[in-house]
From Swiss-Prot:
This is N-acetyl-D-glucosamine kinase. Its EC number is 2.7.1.59. SUPFAM superfamilies: Actin-like ATPase domain. The gene is nagK. Keywords: ATP-binding, Carbohydrate metabolism, Kinase, Metal-binding, Nucleotide-binding, Transferase, Zinc. Zn(2+) binds at H157, C178, C180, C185. CDD domains: ASKHA_NBD_ROK_NAGK. InterPro entries: ATPase_NBD (IPR043129), N-acetyl-D-glucosamine_kinase (IPR023505), ROK (IPR000600), ROK_cs (IPR049874).
Length: 304
């Protein structure tokens, strides 16, 4: 059996999958917030209960909102302070008596979609999350590309380029401070949160993303103008990412991935921001939704 765990700030979810990545069982518990030993024991207890239920020792993969530094072995997950800067893989492996693997949750999302039956024809898959934040993961031949340290795929911390700043009005462009310490990171522009902040700054009105999208479908002039600008901003930024990775397929997740107009508009807006001979890859909506994180974490032990 393949166990995937989604490690969040408020809850930890374990799901059990077979070799076809079909979910057989899941359990969710609150995340301990103050005691590291309690945090470790919570994960160990979840795994042990799954072992007992299925009568075998399953593989253990974690999806975390950060990464485990491959050089130091320490977790860098600032929003789960109880486990931040701790050797979580070493400690869990010792307690569980087996190898434990971990990846950024966006990488797990990309891996889950890459392992979908329909998508296994694509040797390179780029997963982009347009949710509370903007991030991504890159899968090559069924495996996550993590990079030297483990930070590959931190696409939300790429910054606005020349064309994006020009689109937003140069000196009048909204420049947002990012939690990483830099300014103008894509995380604050291409996320659902960024979608709302941009609308407020450019249109002078505070609306939810859902309301803006509803107004767009009602042909509201302000919303249509804004959505067209957002699509162009996304095309500029994603075009750079396509140039870097040249993926066979792109899959979108997160709340904004449910905005169906993006799948019509983005492929049309991308070509001017690519090299002349580049191809716009298929852009698809994620199929596995909220299960993508645990499913991708389980797939860390699968190989093509």
């Amino acid at each position: 059996m393949y166990y995937g765990l989604d490690i969040g700030g408020t809850k930890i979810e374990l799901a059990v999958f077979n070799e076809k990545l079909e979910k057989l069982y899941s359990e969710r518990v609150p995340t301990p917030k103050t005691d590291y030993e309690e945090w470790l024991n919570t994960i160990v207890d979840l795994v042990n209960r799954a072992d007992e239920k299925f009568g075998e020792v399953g593989t253990v993969g974690l999806g975390v909102p950060g990464f485990v530094n491959q050089q130091t072995g320490l977790a860098e997950i600032a929003n789960i302070r109880v486990a931040d800067n701790k050797p979580i893989l070493c400690d869990l492996s010792t307690r569980l008596g087996r190898e434990v693997r971990a990846e950024n949750d966006a990488n797990c999302f990309a891996l889950s979609e890459a392992w979908d039956t329909e998508n296994q024809q694509y040797s390179t898959v780029l997963g982009l999350i347009l949710g509370t934040g903007f991030g991504g993961g890159f899968v090559l031949n069924g495996k996550v590309h993590s990079g030297q340290v483990g930070m590959a795929g931190e696409l939300g911390h790429l910054q606005l380029n020349y064309h994006a700043l020009k689109l937003l009005g140069w000196d009048n462009a909204p420049i947002y401070q990012c939690g990483c310490g830099n300014k103008a990171c894509l995380d604050n522009y291409l996320s659902g949160r960024g979608f709302e902040m941009l609308y407020q700054d450019l249109k002078g009105e505070t609306l939810s993303a859902r309301k803006i999208i509803n107004l767009f479908y009602q042909s509201n002039e302000s919303a249509v103008d804004f959505v067209n600008l957002f699509v162009e901003l996304a095309a500029i930024s994603i075009g750079n990412i396509i140039t870097a990775f040249d993926p066979h397929m792109i899959v979108l997740g997160g709340g904004l991935s449910n905005f169906d107009y993006l799948y019509e508009a983005l492929p049309k807006a991308l070509p001017p921001h690519l090299m002349r001979k580049a191809k716009v890859p298929p852009i698809k909506k994620a199929k596995h939704g909220d299960s993508g994180g645990v499913r991708g974490a389980a797939a860390l032990f699968l190989t093509k």
